[in-house]
Structure formats: C-alpha cells, structure tokens
C-alpha cells in the first residue's frame, strides 16, 4: 500500500488541481464524476485526473489516503476539498471559485 500512497501523494502535491474519478474527463463512468468534470470545465480550470477504475489498489488507496469513502475526490494545491456533493454545493454558492482563486488557480468564469 505504500507504493500507492506514494503515487497518490505525488499526484496530489505536484498538480494544482487533481481529480480522482471513475473514468476520464472525456468519458466519465459515473454520474458523480461527470458532475465534477462539468463544473471544472465550466469554470475553465486546468486539472489533471486519474481513473480509479483502472487500478483496484488506487481505488482503495485513495479512500484511505483521504479518509473519505467515495469517489470522485478533488484536491486543490495538495488539499482534499471533497466529493461530488461538496463540490456541487461549493460551486452553487460561489465558494469553489473563490477557493480556487484564493489558492492561485486561474478560473475563467464564475457561476
């Protein structure tokens, strides 16, 4: 499990915005992952992602890493932000855009 923790840690810390999701941004394989992708794309946020369906160790490891039971999981500047419900709520209230801007992540438009 240490190798997967190192992989997760590297992705989270070396990318300003990183999304662990089911599927890919071009082809999300669950509705919740798709919602987060739509929000990030709407805001014009540059982000990287990993498909947890391709690796069982990653799928389980990310849950342990964040102590959060569900996927997708969004990280900004190394900080776990939340899953689909939290991201959607933050977006609807304008908090996600503000958080991204406060962290120095360019946002192309607001909600």
What do the predicted segments below correspond to?
Residues 1-18, 109-111:
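N-terminal leader/targeting and pre-domain segments
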Residues 6, 59-64:
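TIR-domain catalytic/interaction hotspot
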Residues 9-46:
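Local sequence-structure signature of Cys/Sec-based thiol-disulfide redox active-site neighborhoods
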Residues 18-21, 72-77:
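Cytosolic beta-strand hydrophobic patch enriched in CBS
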Residues 45-59:
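Thiol-based oxidoreductase modules, predominantly thioredoxin-like and allied folds used
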């Amino acid at each position: 499990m240490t190798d997967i923790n190192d992989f997760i840690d590297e992705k989270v810390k070396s990318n300003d915005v990183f999304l662990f999701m089911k599927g890919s941004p071009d082809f999300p394989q669950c509705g919740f992952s798709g919602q987060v992708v739509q929000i990030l794309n709407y805001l014009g946020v540059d982000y990287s992602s990993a498909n947890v369906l391709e690796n069982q160790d990653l799928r389980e490891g990310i849950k342990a890493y964040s102590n959060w039971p569900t996927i997708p999981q969004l990280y900004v500047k190394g900080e776990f932000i939340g899953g689909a419900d939290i991201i959607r709520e933050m977006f609807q209230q304008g908090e996600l855009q503000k958080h991204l801007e406060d962290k120095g992540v360019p946002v192309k438009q607001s909600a």
